[in-house]
Structure formats: structure tokens, C-alpha cells
Design a protein with these regions (language model features):
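Bacterial N-terminal signal peptides that target proteins for export
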Residues: 1-10
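Short acidic, flexible loop segments centered on an aromatic residue
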Residues: 51-74, 174-193, 236-238
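Solvent-exposed coil/turn segments that connect beta secondary-structure elements
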Residues: 61-63, 94, 100-104, 118-120, ...
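A charged, solvent-exposed segment within the mature domains of Sec-exported extracytoplasmic proteins
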Residues: 121-194
């Protein structure tokens, strides 16, 4: 009887919730690079913590977001040299992967990519048993940042929408921003509160806003908030790779 193979591909962000031990580790997960010079290269390391060899391949994609924070990706192999692009990592061993940016050097704003390490499934022994083979993909984030680039987050509007508030933000700067550690101060007649930490991150979802990008964040309207005249002040707390 032929072995029936089921594949389950899990992104790294879901592993903790799946209750499955990591087959391997990738570091770093987020890093900044320059468009040219020595800083246009970086190294990520793939550590095989499994008891068996793993086969990997590395893929580059451009990362984009719409105003709701929904992510999309575009192939970007022409913007990078990845070495080695494929490989076998033995148990307990670490494979270094060099990332060389070779895209446009004259950037007027930062560009964000994912460099994804994909585990390639292998054939299971033909022992007559069925099973599930889990393969893990780790998407690291590579930001190509021109010299002197800065994020500038502006509050465009705060609009009541039933029991919610629609907060519209715009990045008027020329560098990406990660909004995860930031907060929003709401104030009105006889009322003030700060939305931060888990409440903010839950409403935010995807935390990235790219240069020139707009984000619309739906906030739960506080019970004691006035019906009119509510003002929002966004406080950017930047994270460092």
C-alpha cells in the first residue's frame, strides 16, 4: 500500500498557537539594509533543531499593505542575490544565508521585502502508514532604507461608526513604521483615555505602515466617550530591528 502524505504548511507566526515544536529556527527575523555599499548585505541563519536533516529554499518577495492592513506580496527575485538559494541543513547544524540587495540604489523612500525560508517536503518511507508531515515557512522582513529616511505618522481623521471609531493614519514620511508599540490618546469634553498595549495591537492587526501609506484602524468606542467632539492624538513609539 502506498503511503498517503498530507502536508501542513504553517507560517512561523502560528507555530506557538499550533502547539507544534519548531523544526528549525531563523534569525534575525527583522532587519534594515541600505540600498548600496556594505550595508546592502545581511546574513540570516537557519538552525536545524530537528533530529533529521531539513531541505530549505529561500525566496524574496516585495511586501505591500492596503489601508486595512491586508498584506500582499510580489515576486522580487531580481532585487536580491540569495546564497545559497537552496540547501540541506543537518541536525544541530546552522546554515548561513547571505542576502545581497541588488535592486534600485537611488531610493527616495524605504522598500519592504520578505525573505522567506521555506522547508521543502521530503518523501516519507513507503511503510503502508498514513500520516501528516508538517513543513514550516519563516518569513523574515528586510527593509531597504535610504540614508536619513524617517517615518512621519499623521492623524487624518477620527470618525464615529456606531459602537466603533474609525481612526485614519497616514505615513507622510519616507521610512516604514512599525506601530505595534505606539498608542492613541482620545479626548473630549470631560473625557480622556489612552488606547495602548494589547487593546491597541488587537485593533491594529498588521502593525506596518509603509511610506505614503494609509491605515484605517477600527477602535472600540469607550463607553464614556462623548457623542461628538472626540479628538485623537497618535503617539508613535518606534521599534528597532
Amino acid at each position: 500500500m502506498n503511503n498517503f502524505l498530507k502536508l501542513a504548511v504553517l507560517p512561523a507566526t502560528l507555530l506557538a498557537f499550533a502547539g507544534i515544536a519548531h523544526a528549525y529556527q531563523v534569525t534575525p527575523m527583522v532587519y534594515d539594509m541600505k540600498p548600496a555599499g556594505q550595508a546592502a548585505s545581511a546574513v540570516i541563519r537557519v538552525n536545524n533543531t530537528n533530529a533529521a536533516p531539513i531541505t530549505i529554499e529561500v525566496v524574496a518577495e516585495r511586501r505591500l499593505f492596503d489601508e486595512k492592513g491586508t498584506e500582499s506580496r510580489q515576486p522580487a527575485d531580481k532585487d536580491f542575490i540569495l546564497f545559497p538559494p537552496q540547501g540541506v541543513v543537518q541536525p544541530g547544524a546552522t546554515q548561513a544565508v547571505r542576502i545581497q540587495y541588488v535592486g534600485p540604489q537611488q531610493l527616495d523612500k524605504s522598500a519592504t521585502y520578505t525573505i522567506t525560508v521555506k522547508q521543502v517536503p521530503v518523501n516519507l518511507p513507503n511503510d503502508g502508514k498514513s500520516g501528516v508531515q508538517f513543513v514550516f515557512n519563516f518569513s523574515t522582513v528586510a527593509n531597504i532604507v535610504p540614508e536619513g529616511a524617517k517615518a512621519q505618522i499623521e492623524t487624518v481623521s477620527l470618525t464615529p461608526d456606531g459602537k466603533k471609531l474609525k481612526l485614519t493614519l497616514r505615513n507622510a514620511g519616507n521610512k516604514y513604521a512599525n506601530l505595534a508599540l505606539s498608542n492613541v490618546a482620545l479626548s473630549g469634553t470631560g473625557f480622556s483615555t489612552i488606547i495602548k498595549d494589547e487593546a491597541w495591537r488587537k485593533a491594529l492587526g498588521a502593525s506596518w505602515i509603509l511610506p505614503g501609506g494609509t491605515r484605517v484602524v477600527e477602535l472600540a468606542k469607550p463607553d464614556k466617550a462623548p457623542a461628538e467632539g472626540l479628538i485623537a492624538k497618535f503617539n508613535l513609539v518606534e521599534t528597532k530591528p
